[in-house]
């Protein structure tokens, strides 16, 4: 099973052989093993995540082909969503948590063939520990969709500021 192969310490040779024999693309259409050795190098024996490796293989969405648990399916989809967002690892950690942020950073590094940030662990730790300073009760004049849209807008502004804006700064944005 592909999951077992991707969970091994270094699946590069097995995946290369499967790719050369046409087995890999038969199981997972459109995939290629070429970035897996790079990912394995960046993992450095730590944080082996078979979902990250699955994403780095590329190809068509495997969530209907492979038997994934709901948690694995969510992790796969959220990591892809994070890759499309293209934010700093701290912003991804804030939005999705540590696991997705780590997968995101390693996948991007492997796919772009460039090292992940040196302070990756620090960025992820910071992002995952942050709490958005605005609460719905702070915007008690708003309700329903307007409240949700405003919170979303303010959160986006806060993330783009690299989490530097204070509650007071964010509240000023309401009047602009």
Where are these regions (language model features)?
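Loop-centered beta-sheet repeat module
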Residues: 3-20, 27
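Generic amphipathic alpha-helical segments used as scaffolds and interaction surfaces in large
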Residues: 2-9, 67, 141-142
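C-terminal subdomains that position terminal phosphate/3'-OH groups for nucleotidyl transfer/ligation
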Residues: 20-176
């Amino acid at each position: 099973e592909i999951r077992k192969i991707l969970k091994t310490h270094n699946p590069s040779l097995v995946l290369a052989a499967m790719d050369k024999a046409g087995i890999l693309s038969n199981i997972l259409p459109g995939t290629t093993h070429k970035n897996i050795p790079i990912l394995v190098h960046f993992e450095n024996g730590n944080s082996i995540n078979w979902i990250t490796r699955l994403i780095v293989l590329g190809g068509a969405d495997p969530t209907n082909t492979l038997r994934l648990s709901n948690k694995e399916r969510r992790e796969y989809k959220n990591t892809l969503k994070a890759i499309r967002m293209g934010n700093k690892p701290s912003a991804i950690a804030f939005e999705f948590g540590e696991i997705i942020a780590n997968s995101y950073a390693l996948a991007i590094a492997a796919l772009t063939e460039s090292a992940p940030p040196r302070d990756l662990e620090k960025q992820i730790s910071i992002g995952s520990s942050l709490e958005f300073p605005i609460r719905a009760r702070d915007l008690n004049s708003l309700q329903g969709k307007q409240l949700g849209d405003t919170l979303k807008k303010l959160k986006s502004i806060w993330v783009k500021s690299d989490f530097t804006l204070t509650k007071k700064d964010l509240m000023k944005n309401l009047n602009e």
